Amino acid sequence: MSKLKQGTFITFEGGEGIGKSTQCQMLYEYLKSQNIPVILTREVGGTNVAEKMREILVHTDLLPMSELLQAMAARYDHMVKKIIPALQAGNIVICDRFIDSTACYQGLELENGIELVYNLHKDLMPPLMPDLTFFIDVESSIAIERVNSRNMSNKFDVRGLDFYNKIYDCFKGLSKKFPERIVTIKASDLNPEQVHELIKKHLNLI
């Protein structure tokens, strides 16, 4: 029996160049093909306002606290205008990044920043956390090679291997901190179709 029910909130997490967005799209297309109500969205972004904030965040050098607050403001708009209404209407919501990315990308830049991110979410955001998070685990050396081979880039893409390792270690740590929510998919040696099948298997869709 599928683990999915109406109003399930699924997020995909990990660093740059790991195929996370591809897996979001593949799961979205599969659920649509099964006539399951589903929407696909992303962070930072997902609404007109949040997408404008995204452009600032990914292409502008901001102070660490400014960057964190920008991400949180975009999330509030996204949650209130899109995610929560979709869940209340019975949709599965697939989100490409959510709070764990904020913890790793913005929280690491601040003293006790990871704890601060989750506390701010608890205190300021609507009371919602993902039901399930897939961490796409790809080694940093592979991820940075993939990023270097593509034309699109933002300020996070072009940082060096040390940055990629730091982000990778952060997500690994979060997967151990929240094992009841975060499922690790080891994907370094797998193609996108194989990763997709593992995700479907975990959701009891096959």
Curated annotation (Swiss-Prot):
ATP binds at residues 14-21. Coiled coil: none annotated. GO terms for biological process: dTDP biosynthetic process; dTTP biosynthetic process; dUDP biosynthetic process. Pfam families: Thymidylate_kin (PF02223). One of its GO terms (molecular function) is dTMP kinase activity. InterPro entries: P-loop_NTPase, Thymidylate_kin-like_dom, Thymidylate_kin_CS, Thymidylate_kinase. Keywords: ATP-binding, Kinase, Nucleotide biosynthesis, Nucleotide-binding, Transferase. GO terms for cellular component: cytosol. It is an enzyme of class 2 (transferase). The keyword Manganese does not apply. Its EC number is 2.7.4.9. It catalyses: dTMP + ATP = dTDP + ADP. Belongs to the thymidylate kinase family. NCBIfam families: DTMP_kinase. Phosphorylation of dTMP to form dTDP in both de novo and salvage pathways of dTTP synthesis. This is Thymidylate kinase. The gene is tmk.
